Amino acid sequence: MTTTADQLMATARKASLLLTLLAATAFGCAHEGGGAAAPAAPVNATDAVAQAEAGGPLFGQFCAKCHGDAGQGTDQAPPIVGGSALPLDPRPTAKYRKTQFHTAKDVFDFVAAYMPPKGPKPSPDQYLAILAFGLKANGIDLAGKPPLTPDNLSAIVIHP
């Protein structure tokens, strides 16, 4: 049974996510137009939540064009936010993904190798911020955790 407080919290989380995704999309659309990306600025985050916040605009810049403004997926790319995002096994129609996503490290390795498929690539720090943003958007609790690094990603289990 869901309480009114639970419903209010769920609505607040959805509204917060929507505002973050809209801000990220606005940033991304402002930079759409071809050409090389601006030089990669380092992502200086003191914890994983701050890193996720820095990842929002980067999602808009590097991911929203294919995966949709809210990460909902498009005819070009699957959803990366929501109930069908980050499944354990690749979809049968997957163009690039052939591996399972057990941990955040699996996701990072795939994304860093294949995404985006065209155009400029994010820096390693930017990939980590985008990953933190995606994990947080999918309900993975990052509160109190240090910034994501290649060394601590295996500790974040997505599918046991």
Sequence positions of predicted segments:
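Bacterial N-terminal signal peptides that target proteins for export
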Residues: 4-17
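C-terminal motif of bacterial Sec signal peptides marking the signal peptidase cleavage site
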Residues: 25-28
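Electrostatic cytochrome c docking/interface patches
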Residues: 30-58, 74
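The canonical Cys-X-X-Cys-His
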Residues: 55, 59-70, 130, 134
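Gly/Gly-Pro-rich "capping" loops immediately C-terminal to redox-active cysteine motifs
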Residues: 72-107
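An amphipathic alpha-helix signature
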Residues: 101-112, 124, 128-132
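Flexible coil segments in periplasmic/lumen-exposed cytochrome c-class electron-transfer proteins
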Residues: 122-160
